[in-house]
Amino acid sequence: KFIIQNRTPFMQSFLYWANVSVHANNDYQVQFPPNTVYGTSHSKTQYTNWPVTAVGDQELDTSWWKNWKGSNSTFAVNYSDDFLSGYDFGADAGTIHFANHHVVPGKKFFLWGTESVWNEMLTEEDGAYLELMVGTYSDNQPDYSWIGPNEVRSTTQYWYPIKGIGGAKEATLEAAVNLERISPSSMMVGFNVTEKYNNARVLVKEGDKVLYEGRTDIAPDTFWKKE
């Protein structure tokens, strides 16, 4: 929980971004919510397509850590979703951030670079890392917000782990869900939850058509996946 109080009789500026570092490697992907189609830079001076965009003379999927050579900050142009995720496909595990997007609109990732020198300088023998970042009352840096005299503001944010489902297309405080097209006639659906559910109903629909319906027990230390 984040609480900020202005104890002065004057209007004050503030900037707050939460920063979680995660292990990064060639299997790591940043997953902005699916309806994110643009990214932007600091101060919103440049915009790019997301996730596939031009890097030099190549078209690259820049959601993957391996496709960056130098340092980079990318902010999601997204003002409607409450979550951000990142996933290590080698470890088959990842991280979800969840918060009210009206209060925590900022979604960003930062990396120093993918060369080995950064490992030596920053983590010694612990490997590369990437920063998942979220902004409270701010969607960019340095995009300051303002707080009035004697005003108090607060917000609550949540981070939780996911595994076994290949990332997330949607997430709430209770669960993360992934949906992937495997072939023209098949798909994968997977869930992680943040509390235990017994005999939970799983329903997958396309419009009014029921594609799958079943029951399962699921808890935070397990996952559900069906192809």
Set out the residue ranges of the language-model regions.
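Short, hydrophobic/aromatic beta-strand segments
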Residues: 9-16, 168-169, 199-203
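Aromatic sugar-binding surface patches on proteins
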Residues: 218-226
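Short Pro-Gly-centered flexible turn/kink motifs
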Residues: 2, 145-162
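Asparagine-centered strand-capping/turn motif at beta-strand->loop junctions
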Residues: 3-9, 191-193
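Short coil/turn motifs at secondary-structure junctions
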Residues: 6-9, 162-163, 207
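A contiguous, surface-exposed recognition patch within enzymatic or periplasmic domains that forms
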Residues: 7-152
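Beta-strand-rich binding/interaction modules
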Residues: 186-215
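Surface beta-strand/loop "capping" patches
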Residues: 165-197
